[in-house]
């Protein structure tokens, strides 16, 4: 098995990335969040795929299709809330991951950092278009307000907003294209994640001391696979507590009111 792991064209890539990878011996729990982000991304793609099987991206039926998922689809409520709260966990991990990078000077690894910035912005875009899909009041007015920010661009602003909307307001065309973007962007994110890892493994990871750790490396497996597994268990525990006990605590009650272009949410 060891010979195959080290020589097989596909397995040796995995081997050099997750098994025999030389890793600094002193990286702390702040370094766990990269793997947690990978887990979050997998959860989001899987739950999102199953949601897409039942969702309809039409203004007349989008809201009721989400209700249908929660009420009529087997474990649809679980899939929907895993996806919604999984997105929140994704961003919590993302902020900590970036914060650790700033605190410990990981921005010195410029290629890895720049791909990370692209990942951050792409994830924000994905979350934004995804929030519009349930077509509640906050979905509709959130989309209206955020896209309207582009109208501040001199000369081309108004035309740009109408181009993104596909009309003169957030409507059917907007919802359809946002669903298309929301479906494709996670796969683009996955591709960028591989590039992010590629650049990271070119230089090796940073470590809390900030010193060169080439003289003190240990194999990634079993040491950091076990450490990451603990992080994953804790992440899933927090996620499941949210999903099973407090599924709506991070959401807005106004999004349970269908989108109405004639009324802004009560505030």
UniProtKB/Swiss-Prot annotation:
GO terms for cellular component: mitochondrial inner membrane. Its cofactor is heme b. One of its GO terms (molecular function) is metal ion binding. The keyword Membrane applies. Keywords: Electron transport, Heme, Iron, Membrane, Metal-binding, Mitochondrion, Mitochondrion inner membrane, Respiratory chain, Transmembrane, Transmembrane helix, Transport, Ubiquinone. PROSITE patterns: CYTB_CTER, CYTB_NTER. Coiled coil: none annotated. Binds 2 heme b groups non-covalently. Pfam families: Cytochrome_B (PF00033). GO terms for biological process: mitochondrial electron transport, ubiquinol to cytochrome c. It is found in: Mitochondrion inner membrane. The chain crosses the membrane at residues 33-53, 77-98, 113-133, 178-198, 226-246. It comes from the Eukaryota. Component of the ubiquinol-cytochrome c reductase complex (complex III or cytochrome b-c1 complex) that is part of the mitochondrial respiratory chain. The b-c1 complex mediates electron transfer from ubiquinol to cytochrome c. Contributes to the generation of a proton gradient across the mitochondrial membrane that is then used for ATP synthesis. Heme 1 (or BL or b562) is low-potential and absorbs at about 562 nm, and heme 2 (or BH or b566) is high-potential and absorbs at about 566 nm. Belongs to the cytochrome b family. PANTHER family: CYTOCHROME B. The cytochrome bc1 complex contains 11 subunits: 3 respiratory subunits (MT-CYB, CYC1 and UQCRFS1), 2 core proteins (UQCRC1 and UQCRC2) and 6 low-molecular weight proteins (UQCRH/QCR6, UQCRB/QCR7, UQCRQ/QCR8, UQCR10/QCR9, UQCR11/QCR10 and a cleavage product of UQCRFS1). This cytochrome bc1 complex then forms a dimer. This is Cytochrome b.
């Amino acid at each position: 098995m060891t010979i195959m792991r080290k020589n097989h064209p596909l397995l040796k890539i995995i081997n050099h990335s997750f098994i025999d990878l030389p890793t600094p011996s002193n990286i702390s729990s702040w370094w766990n969040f990269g793997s947690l982000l990978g887990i979050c991304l997998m959860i989001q793609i899987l739950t999102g795929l199953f949601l897409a099987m039942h969702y309809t991206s039409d203004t007349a039926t989008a809201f009721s299709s989400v209700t249908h998922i929660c009420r009529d689809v087997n474990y649809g409520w679980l899939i929907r809330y895993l996806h919604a709260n999984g997105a929140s966990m994704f961003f919590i991990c993302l902020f900590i991951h970036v914060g650790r990078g700033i605190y410990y000077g990981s921005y010195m690894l410029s290629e890895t950092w720049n791909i990370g910035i692209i990942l951050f912005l792409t994830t924000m875009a994905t979350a934004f278009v995804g929030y519009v899909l349930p077509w509640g009041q906050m979905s509709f007015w959130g989309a209206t307000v955020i896209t309207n920010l582009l109208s501040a661009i001199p000369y081309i602003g108004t035309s740009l907003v109408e181009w993104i909307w596909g009309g003169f307001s957030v409507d059917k065309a907007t919802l359809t294209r946002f669903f298309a973007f929301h479906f494709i962007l996670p796969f683009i994110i996955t591709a960028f994640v591989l590039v992010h890892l590629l650049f990271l493994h070119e230089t090796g990871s940073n470590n809390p001391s900030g010193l060169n750790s080439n003289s003190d490396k240990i194999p990634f497996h079993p040491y950091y696979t076990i450490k990451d597994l603990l992080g994953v268990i804790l992440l899933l525990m927090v996620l499941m507590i949210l999903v099973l006990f407090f599924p709506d605590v991070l959401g807005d009650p106004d999004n349970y009111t269908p989108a109405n272009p004639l009324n802004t949410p009560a505030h």
